[in-house]
Amino acid sequence: MGWNEAIKLRSASLPALCLLYVTCALDASGAASYAKEAVITETAGTVRIAADSPRPLEQVLNALQSKYGWIVNYEDPQYVSAVDVIKASSDSQVPSGGSFTFEFSSAAPDEGKTLRQLVDTYNKSKNPGHFELRHTADGGFNVVGTAGHSDKGEIVEQQAPFDLALTLSNKEQTIDETVTRICAEVSRQSRSNVVLAISPRKILFQNRVALGGNKVAARELLSKSLGATHGKIYWRLLFDPESKNYYLNLHLVHGV
């Protein structure tokens, strides 16, 4: 998929994207008995985070960010089997996540150790997807979906879209154009389209970056692009079981 085609897909995907947002909003509001956000309690030296969401692991990461300021990128695997997908209250398909509880010591928790424990605990639960914790060169963390279930309930390995090695000519563009170009190249090489959805558009349009590389992981290119904003931006790469598209949501951390 070329850059122009990616722009067209981005525009054409807006109606489906709006439907996806509405579905998520309905689910989060309790129409499908999901919680809007995870509940955090702390007793007897133990922190307990109770999530209830189609994507409970992401909800726990959001709670950890709220409590400790830990900024962690999150990427869905593909939810394609009957085991990993259910009908939502709006009659659209969503990941089949639900209740998930994570507990850890409240005594000066270490970010890396706690995140490792979180991912290991999640992978042992009955919730959809299988994840890995990845360290970044700058000391950050990515939680990456690397597997889903088959219709028989077996774990099937998948290639994470942002693991793909990209070759891009060095070109100076707005960061919005650069991220769209990365998404277009990932879409061209993978089985799913990746569409830039939510983002701090003003920042992405006002800042420019000269970026390229030979066989560089898409995740690294994306991270470098966002770093050029001189702000703190994290991402959520969410797979939509209805359209089979990935939607890349970029969020600006304020006050950092």
Placement of each model-derived feature along the sequence:
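N-terminal targeting/assembly segments of extracytoplasmic apparatus and virion spike/baseplate proteins
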Residues: 1-256
